[in-house]
Amino acid sequence: MKALRKQKIETANIQVGDQMVIPLAELGEFTATAHKVTDESVMFIFDEYVTCRPMNNCSTNKGGFEKSDLKKWMDTVLFMAFPEELRDKIYGLTIPTVGQIVGHEDEWDNKNLEPDSDEQLPLMKECKNRIACFEDQLTWGWLRNATKEGFSSARFANVYYGGYA
């Protein structure tokens, strides 16, 4: 019989699929999974949404994600919610791109969303890893890509309940 066991271990070598529980000040404790590991960095993505916020306080995607109200909140409030020992190791907070979550196969995405050159993350090839909840309720979440101006000047891509962007 084969069994998959999860154990807590101390390690300096993070691998894709490793998970860690991160206490976020007044937001609660959240599990994050390592999705990409390089010699210089590790990309963790929270398994659940830590908050439910608009991308911008007004209906616009001008400036993209980098100039959004959500990014400003992440760089200030969310960043400070991390434990101090992790803040020293964080090289920037962001949200995934369409490419990282579902790849670049969808014709509609390629035609209507700002492009990215990111490859689909290995764990995201399984639909179950693209689905997330907020406060134990299945919901959708933002992706970094804004819609192109010819389609809409107010929208961003998102990943839906079924794991599709």
Model-derived regions, located:
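Collagenous Gly-X-Y triple-helix signature in extracellular proteins
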Residues: M1-A165
